[in-house]
């Protein structure tokens, strides 16, 4: 089936935004978001993003899909976010190199140094930052998960300086890092 031959297919991208601060006496307690925003929903999914690069992002069956492009490309949210939960359901091929970029500092030039990247890359040469890791920040837990050729759910929480990546209900990375506090979110397609 052609739908499943793509590098990455994202069927749902929801963003939970925190509306208030928590009690400072419990700094590690992370509340549930107060509001959820669906960024990919039916035929209006691409309207919430700017394109960086030339991947052929298309809307298909209430999802967003990319199958080709020259080099890495991103869909970048038009808004910036500081504290949030991202929930993404996706299908990726086993050779995919993709990721969810967060708190990006320059929405026109996306890098894994100027954003936090929750990786989707089963075949990464250095597996410490493979699928489930936060590149350059938090190595993936062992054993490293694989996501190729099946449906997966990524849930990423950014609250204050804390970043938690959960893949298919397993925590794969958990780190405190205060370098990046706010910015757009990007979805990557890489050749």
Residue ranges of model-derived segments:
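Bacterial N-terminal signal peptides
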Residues: 8-18
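Carbohydrate-interacting regions of secretory-pathway proteins
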Residues: 20-191
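Bacterial N-terminal signal peptides that target proteins for export
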Residues: 1-9
